[in-house]
Each structure stands twice: as C-alpha cells, then as structure tokens.
C-alpha cells in the first residue's frame, strides 16, 4: 500500500505543504523584483548612444553643483554664463558645418536667446478671502530653439506681434537655479544637463526634429516659479503646444512620471525604455493632497500647453539640503531621466497628427486642442500602460454588471445549503454547506484592524520611525496581518472544518472588491479621479477566482444523489464508498452499515462483455482514481487510503470529488495582478511620503496607507491561508515581535536619513535685534539647538505659529551676518543705512503712495503690509491679463526680484479706507486723513548666498555643531532678512 500512496502524491494538491511552498514562491517571485525596481536604478550604458555623451553630462553636473546657486547669488550669474558657453560649444560644430555645406536643409538651425529683457508683475491669485502675494520678476532665462524640418522658415519672432505658422512646437524645461541650502544635483541639475544633451542629440545628423524644439533653461523656479511665469512674455511661448518638465522633488533614484495633462500626450512617455510612475501621484495633486508645485502649473494652467512632469521623488530627506549633490546621486539616475527625456521628446517632435493643434476653449491660451483624462502606470519598470479614463469607466461598469450575473446564474449546489430533504420520506440529510460562510469577514476585519492599531501605536509612541525604517514598518504590518489571519483561520478550520472555506472566502472578496469598484467608478466619472485603477484588475481577478470556485462544484454529486446514497437508497451499481457521510450528517434511521456500503452485497457479480476493465474503480473530476468496494480482506487499508486521498481531515465527506489543483489557478489569477499593481503603488507611495513628517505633515497618513496596502496585498492569501503549515507563520510572528520592538524604541533619524530643519536669520533694523530661528519637530529641534554654542545660556523662545502643521519655530539671538559684500565693513554693529535704503512719498489727499526700495549686495526685496493694499504697480513692468497682479482680496505682500544687483525698485500702491470699500480716487479729504487711512508695514531685503564661510556665521555654526542626523534647509526666500518698519499716513 505504500507504493500506492506514493503514486497518489500530488505536488499541487490543496494540502499544507504544496500550498505553503507554492504560495511563498509566487509571492517572493513577484515582491523581490518589485523591491529591486523601486530600490535599484537601471545601469547607464557602457558606450554612449548616438548623439549623447554621458561622461560629458556627468562632468557638467559636477560643475553645475560646485556651489549653491539660488537666483539671489553671485554664483547664479556664473552658472548663467557657463550655460551660454556650453550651449555655444555644443552647437558650434553644427553652425560651422552649416556654413560649409551647400545643402543646409539637412542641418537644423539653432537660435539662442539670452532673455535679459522680459519682466512681469503677477500674483498667486489668492484663495477665498485670503490676501494674495504680488510678484515682480526680471528674466534671466536662456531659451534655445531648434528649428524643425516642417517649421516655418521665417524668423517670425523678429517682427512686432509676429505669430508662428504651422504646427506647434515642443517645450522641454528645467530650471538652473537651486535653493540657497542645496547644491541642486537633482533639483534641478540633472534636468539642466539633460537639456544640454537633448541639444546635442537633436543637432546630431540623423536626429533632426520634424517639429520645432524649444529648450528652456529657466531661472527663478525655486522662489515662486518665477522663470516659467516670465517665459510667458517671450514670443516662443506662443509657439510651443506640448511640454516636458524636468524636475526634482527628491535626490536620486528613478525619475518618475508623476503628472500629465491627458492621455494623448502621455502615450509618448511609453517610448522610454524604463518607464516609472503612476497616475496616483497626479490625482494626489488634483485632490490637494500634494501641495508643492512645479512649472507644470504655469505651462498648463496659464499658457494652456499639454505635457508631462518628470521628477525625482525620493529620498525627501536630501531634498533642498547639502546632500542634493553628485555624491548622493549617480550617473545611472542621470541616464534614467535623460533616456526618458530623449524617448518622450523624440516622440513629440516626430508626431505629425493634429491632436495638439486644435482650437482651445480658452482664447487666452495657445491652440493646443483638448485632451482626454487618462490612466497610466508602469509594470516592472519595463512596460507602460496608458488608456483613457472613459475606457476605465466603461469597462468597470460592464464588469460590475456582468460579473455578478455570471456568479448568480452559476449553480451553487452545496453552497448556502445546510441539509437536503429526501423525496418521499422527508428525511433530512445534513450537508453542512453553510459552514465557513461567516468566518471570512470576521477574520479579515480582525486582521485588518491590527495594522491600523499598529499605525495608531506608532503615531503615539515613535511617529517618525518610518522616516528611516519604512521596510521595518512594512515587515511589522505584513507579519502581523499574516500571522493573525493564519491563526484565526486555522482555529476556525479546526473547530468547524469546511471544504467550502475557499469558495466562501473568494465570494466575500468578490463582494468587497465589487463595492470598492463601484465607489471608484463613481469618482472616476464625477471627479475624474483615476488613482483606483488597480481596483478594476483586482475585481476582475477576484471574479475569475470566485467563478472557478463555483465551477468546481460541478465535480460534486448532486445533493439529491448524495442524500439518497447516504441512506442506502441508490442502486449498488452507482454507489461508492467515497461518498460516505459521517454519522453526524445522517438524520434518518438508516443503519450505519447500509449507509456506508450500500453496494457491498451486490458487487461480486460475474463479469460480462460490458463490464469495465477498471472494474470497481472510478475517476473523479480531479483525475484521482478511487477503488470501488472490493473484497473484505483489504477493506481496512483501503478505507485509510480513502481518508488520505479523499476528503481533507474532517471536512464534509461529499467534498472528496472536488478538484485539488484549481487553487493554483485561482492564486495565479488574483495574486500576481495584485502584487504587480498594488505592490508598486504601495512602494511608490511610501517612498515619496515616508519622510514628509519633517515638513510638518502627520505621519499617521503614511502609517494608515501602509495598513491599507498591507490588507490589499495579503487578501489573495486568505482563501488559502488555513492550509499553511505552522513554519512560515511562526517565523513571521517572530519577525513581528522583533520589528515591533525596534519600531517603538529605535531612534528615527540617521546621517543617511536626516531630519530636516528650516533656517532663517532676521535682522530688525529699527532696534538692531538679530534673531536666528530654526523650524522643526519637537523634541528633536530642542536637541539640535542645545548643541549650538551661541544658543547656550539663552532664553530660547518656541511657538507653533508656523504654516507647517506640526512644526515649531524656536528663536534666539544669533551671530551677526556679514552679507553686505566685500569692501564693506564687518557688520558687527547693525547700521540701518548700510542694509536698506527706501523712500516713501504719499500722494496728498489720496490713499496712494510711491515706495522706492533698494538693498545692499542683493537683488531681492519685498514689501509687507499690515493690511492688504488694493493695487500696486512696479515702474517699467509688463502686465499680462492672464496673470493679473491684484484681485478683490487685495495684496498683502509684494516680492521684488531684479536681474541687476542693488537695483532700486519704484512701486506705486493704493489702498482702500476699509476692507468693504472699493477703490475710489475721488474720496473726500477728510476720509483720507482719518486714522483708518493709515497704512503700515515693513520694507524687507533678503540675502541668500551662503557659498563663502563667514558670510552667514549663524548658518555656518548650525551646520558645524548640529547633530549629524540634522539637515538644514531654507525657511523662506532669503537666508537672512533685514527689515525696516514704516507707516504711511
């Protein structure tokens, strides 16, 4: 009998060891590649592709990031001149070849515009009754135009009011300014050197663009998207219809596509070899969950261009800090963005269709046509899926209707059946078909509650551990969910075993995903939200897995046949010992011997011509051969085989004919699609959000997202988990204990994952006070300040009056800054006239005034008012009706930026007598002289150049003495702000 049992071993049977091994292999085979994709950047090619020089690009990046280069710094001017030199060196061979060639049609014309003329006054538009911020900015953008082979040959921009003809061109944008506290390797140095390589690529013979290509090296993005705004005043802004914006919101890794305008333009990103990104991030912006903005909002929202946002998203702890340098990124990251830029741009400039040249609905925007909302995501970093949101909606509606109908019309047989009545006698035969029906929702809710409780626990005890240990958090939640679900499922199976556990589990999963898909479909239709696209595939997999469970039931005998057989009323020729019920399933008075072996008496008949060669045997739906009732000599041993090869342990006896391999098919239909789509989303989300706590965002959102995604990823395991052996759950329980202890007691920051704090030094020129402030999260902020020598022994004042959520701002009297430039006296004493000069002239009898302001060794100042002014105008400024400088809310602050150092701005302002009055230049003199006509505020200038040690000693001191797990970033436009108070009456 041993050899017989060995032959019956099935490596894919629904028994503990096959289930444990196969399920583990499937999950590891999918999760490991997903982890690799999110953690490892594809290698750059060893040899340069045609038209690209990666070595040159890396050297350019190293030069660009040799110092801090914010707009308000001398090094920014050096970078500007260096870029012009690099551009000219790249296009020089093309220009010289064109001059020597008689057939210049094959060589693209290249035009370089050093835009030092454009300026603009605009505002942020305001929200509700909030006063807006007005901005005046002078351009230092560099614009390169590569004429396409199908472009108008006329230099139309040289004519006044000249307009382009033909199809619109393509804009690729990156900003060459950095923040004052970061070297800007990924924000946005890689974008800048990618533009240089795009220039080289499209001026290489054979790579000529069909449509014109505009490369915008914009300056001033970090402070208020100023460079993109002022680009709107250049003639080429009317030529481009599509765009690709290169950005950085992290400091390395892969460049992610995290926002696009429509389906049609997104398809061109599919040309890249290593796509990466999801529509989830785009919907985060749409729903207001992500508040930081890029030049994308200017190109699309104001100019009406259609395009894509490509950016680095992690790690945010290095973003805007001194670790955003070439040491902490790689040539692989550079190649990932560059290759995506080349693939996308090449597709856009080669496109000959009319999708991007239709009439615009807004006459103030370019005629770029109208796109459709899209759904897009990558798969394993090698394939890219993109389709219309309307397609998602239509398929979702169809599946929501068809799937339940298919399930409903499929014969459920033993499902939901407790017993079967015998015809004629009325006897009830127990089927136990409802056993296992209610356990799934109870266990799933319990298992899901645990990660949510853990999220609350971490938020209360150690809220920032995810900052440096996101995978420890993931491991804790995964192990807790799986162990608890396994324990409860095994307990339920022990006390009430059921062969229908899998069918009921898939049914509940089907119901839950159906509800979620309904909600997602409503949001997709009404709000245009596509982030739940994975639910369509999740539901489709759940539907197919559920349907298979229902189709399995066709392998069972009919309930009536089983009932008659258990009471001995079926003919012996149709009977089988393997359909025997246990004693507690029989509610009739039939004798056990008759019920168990109803055909024993008539089995030894003589064979005839019609007798089967496999006499006494039958084949089940699962292709298991079972013996019929043979001789009494082997009855005991054969009964033992039946128990091992038929029903599993104490499950319903009618279940022996159920297929034993279909669980593998169900696993493969549901688990891979869930792991691929949901797994990538989970890692993408946590990688981009795990370090937002240092920005004042609640980390509970991150932990809650981990808990939800843990459940979504583990649900495909649940129908099978009661068959697991104890080995893996026990191991995971130990993992849970270890990671829980670590997550509760470990210090959340490290030199590789630093806590970001925000620095500013404010000098009050009225009283000579000098205040240094750091903004961050407590109690870590206090620990950092206690390590600073100049703060020792001082009364540190802290408050939460910041716009950054949970952050606190702590201040003390700091070291005096030396920002007035070389050749001037050291600023050990605050002399107001050396810092800012300003003059205010009020118009007699009116609520009008002219303010002249200038700062020493700076080109950035601002005016802040205690109450909003109605209107303002900067002398010599252009105004664009698409971006009005004021609104009915009024202007509370005016920011002034100049391309010229120590420039004097002349600003005319007027203000209302009260918040309810409209502007009226003919108001009575008595009203204007009344106290309510008094306007007070501050004249402020800013300094942002920290390249030389000793210029801002307080900043040098913080960097030198702060703990290694502290990073310093800017708190405002300037590192140092000096202010004068004024009153106009």
Swiss-Prot record:
Its main location: membrane. Zn(2+) 1 binds at residues 175, 187, 247. InterPro entries: Fxna-like_M28_dom (IPR048024), M28_fam (IPR045175), Peptidase_M28 (IPR007484), PFF1_C (IPR053975), PFF1_TM (IPR053976). Keywords: Glycoprotein, Hydrolase, Membrane, Metal-binding, Metalloprotease, Protease, Transmembrane, Transmembrane helix, Vacuole, Zinc. CDD domains: M28_Fxna_like. It is a multi-pass membrane protein. It comes from Ajellomyces capsulatus (strain G186AR / H82 / ATCC MYA-2454 / RMSCC 2432) (Darling's disease fungus). The active site is at 221 (proton acceptor). This is Vacuolar membrane protease. Residues 566-582 have a biased composition (Low complexity). Its EC number is 3.4.-.-.
